[in-house]
């Protein structure tokens, strides 16, 4: 259907000057504009695929209602955390809470658990994962028993979760990675979405079948992780001149998973469409921001999933919406934190700005 530019302009004016409209009507108007502006005809009129991150945030963020009960705003679980790395799983899990999830779990190794528990009493920490050194003296049969126990501990919680974050602080221990690969299969069997980051991407890059053709999988690679994915899957080098087309090809080759390529502009694709998010941002590149992003994607993806039961909800892929929303919010929070702290900005400063940033875009009252 040909959509006249005058119609688009009218809709934009309507959404910009309707303060008395109900929030539900306004959200439908905003989504209609986004949908039309993303149509093939309108895309041909524009050279950009920039997503309206703030509008997506307002669309997917649920309103606060006294009738809601604990858990309805999201139950997130982070699979990660070992002897060497305890900060990353904490950043991902606490970010999920700061954005608005009701419950946030961390499944980590026994060595990491006391440390992560000490960071915050808000997190539910499960010290159930095992590393090779702790079972090195066991027979193969006993090792399998340990693995079965680990999988049983995680599996009994699986269907309670709205989304998993797999990889922050995971490390590359062979036994641990083997257990996590089976956890991913359990999640797929239960249709639980998951976000893969950090060392989870190392695992997936070497075992693409773990995520292939699973539409509820999201990969969030940084520049080096993306390079390894491209080399492994497409058997070529990263092509910055055709970045969008290459990202689309990569996501399509992995069976339509959603990939959020982090960078100066975040690029997002599920093999069909490509969206970019470049608003806000910060020149401070302290470690841990990717963990905030993965926790945020998990929350917004779960919220977008909840919208699917609403006949007036957006029809776009929940994973795409989750990535756009999380990217936009992180960029705004990072910008705000940098304004306050400049060169001394840390990941913890950005986390403290998440609530303020979301409130500015999508007021709770």
Curated annotation (Swiss-Prot):
InterPro entries with a match to the protein in the record: CARKD (IPR000631), Ribokinase-like (IPR029056)
Catalytic reactions of this protein: (6S)-NADHX + ATP = ADP + phosphate + NADH + H(+); (6S)-NADPHX + ATP = ADP + phosphate + NADPH + H(+)
Signal peptide annotation: none
A cellular component term, taken from the record's GO annotations: chloroplast
Keywords: Acetylation, ATP-binding, Chloroplast, Cytoplasm, Lyase, NAD, NADP, Nucleotide-binding, Plastid, Transit peptide
Organelle targeting sequence: 1-43
Superkingdom in the source lineage: Eukaryota
E.C. numbers: 4.2.1.93
PROSITE patterns: YJEF_C_3
Function: Catalyzes the dehydration of the S-form of NAD(P)HX at the expense of ATP, which is converted to ADP. Together with NAD(P)HX epimerase, which catalyzes the epimerization of the S- and R-forms, the enzyme allows the repair of both epimers of NAD(P)HX, a damaged form of NAD(P)H that is a result of enzymatic or heat-dependent hydration.
Protein name, entry field: ATP-dependent (S)-NAD(P)H-hydrate dehydratase
Originating organism: Arabidopsis thaliana (Mouse-ear cress)
